[in-house]
Structure formats: C-alpha cells, structure tokens
Amino acid sequence: MSLKHTELRKLFSNFWEKKGHKEVPPIPLVPQNDPTTLFTGSGMQQLVPNLLGEPHPLGKRLYNIQRSFRSQDIEEIGDNRHTTMFEMMGNWSLGDYFKQEQIPWFHEFLTKELSIDSKRLFVTIFAGGSGVPKDTESYDLWKKLGIPTDRIHEYDDKKNWWSRAG
C-alpha cells in the first residue's frame, strides 16, 4: 500500500475517532507559554499537565498529529533514520484504558487500516530498569496477537524509555 502523508493522517484520525477519541489541535512548533523548551519536541508536550492528572476539556480519549523538532542528534541528519522536523502521531488515554486495549488497537491500525502484514512487524517492550520491572504484560499481548517471540525485542531504559526530551 502506497500512501501520501495526507492519506495517512486521514486514516489515523478516522481510526481513533471510531474508538471514541477527540482530536487535540497541534501547538506551534515554537511553543507559547512553555519556558522549559525552545521547540515542540513531541506530541505529548502540550498534554503533560493532563498526563499528570489534570482533566482535559476534550475528555479522556485523545489523539493528535503534532509537528515536532528535535536537535539532539543533529549531527546524524541525512542518514535514513534521523530528521530534525517531523509529524508525530499519537493517541492518548487519560486514565480511560491501558495496554489491554491499546496494543490490540494499534495492531489493528497497522494490519487492517494500513494493510501491513503482521508477520512483518517488529515490536519493542521495556526490559526493565531504573527501578521499573520488565513489561511482561506487553510481551504477552504482542505474542497473543501473533507476533513471533524473535520479533519482540526487549530494551532497557537507555534505549526504550519515553520522555519529553525524546
């Protein structure tokens, strides 16, 4: 399947709207009212207060498509893996659901909406670190969805830990 970026955005938006999510409009690439950073570096940036417990006016199920800028690996720009500006697509549950729904839904998006053969997928799980145990629940869910164990890779907090900084 060959898609234009506008088609991918539409498929992503439609999928999450069918799951009861509301779109959070993107914030500017140079964020206003955030003295902690020069640029918007992730889709979660504007949602930090909500991820910490503050209710969001649009509800508990959200998605966004956020222009993001990252410069921490700027010396590597130009290879096939590094960019400075990109659009980050994300869906968010603010205490409404967790892995048991999220992982099968994302698998559904990849395999049904984007027609990616499940046998071609590789996934990562958190191997544990920084006082946080291994994520065996995600491992079991991916395995149950048919992802072979040799395609489920475990990484520690140095390689597989999401943070605002990316």
Regions found by a protein language model. Give the residues of each.
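Structured aminoacyl-transfer and RNA-binding surfaces used for tRNA recognition/handling
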Residues: 1-166
